[in-house]
């Protein structure tokens, strides 16, 4: 059957996603852009007998986001050095070695599925390589294991999603082979 995918730009209220430099991490529907919310899109999909999918990039944040304002310690960074950024000169990578961050990332999918169970597909993007090899969560003697622990954290999140939503089709993509 046919599938409509709502791509990047559907989220962010304090910082509406109007380009690549804000709002990653603020996974709330932008009321200005979608006054009927995702519910309106789902109703249209039902009317036209097509499935609905949605784009997310839950491993990332922007320095211009509510998430970054609330949890700057959730970002991969090296102490006493300027923060490296990716797309839009504001994109940063969340620290998936941290169980609280793993819970947040799982929660992105879980909240969408709880609120919109008709979602049949998620495009999980990853448009930023790990830029700063430093974790405020890992102890000093484990910093050299950052990439391994990051991927273990990602696998834990994906296993939780698959266990709870076995029918959800997910496409994990990585711009430029970032993963």
Briefly describe each language-model feature range.
Residues 1-11:
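Catalytic domains of carbohydrate-active enzymes, especially glycoside hydrolases
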Residues 5-7, 53-57, 123-125, 171-173:
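A cross-family glycoside hydrolase active-site/sugar-binding cleft signature
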Residues 11-69, 163:
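Acidic/aromatic-lined carbohydrate-recognition and catalytic surfaces
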Residues 30-48, 69-179:
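Active-site neighborhood of glycoside hydrolase catalytic domains
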């Amino acid at each position: 059957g046919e599938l409509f995918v709502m791509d990047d730009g559907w989220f962010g209220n304090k910082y509406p996603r109007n380009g690549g430099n804000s709002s990653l991490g603020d996974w709330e529907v932008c009321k200005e852009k979608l006054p009927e919310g995702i519910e309106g899109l789902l109703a249209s999909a039902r009317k036209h007998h097509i499935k609905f999918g949605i784009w997310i990039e839950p491993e990332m944040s922007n320095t211009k986001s509510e998430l970054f304002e609330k949890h700057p310690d959730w970002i991969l960074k090296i102490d006493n050095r300027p923060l490296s950024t990716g797309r839009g000169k504001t994109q940063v990578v969340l620290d998936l070695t941290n169980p609280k961050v793993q819970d947040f990332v799982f929660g992105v999918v879980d909240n969408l599925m709880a609120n919109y169970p008709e979602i049949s597909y998620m495009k999980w993007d990853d448009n930023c390589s790990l830029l700063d090899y430093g974790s405020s969560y890992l102890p000093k003697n484990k910093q050299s294991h950052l990439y391994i622990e990051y991927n273990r954290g990602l696998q834990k999140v994906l296993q939780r999603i698959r266990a709870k939503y076995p029918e959800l089709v997910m496409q994990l993509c990585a711009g430029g082979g970032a993963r």
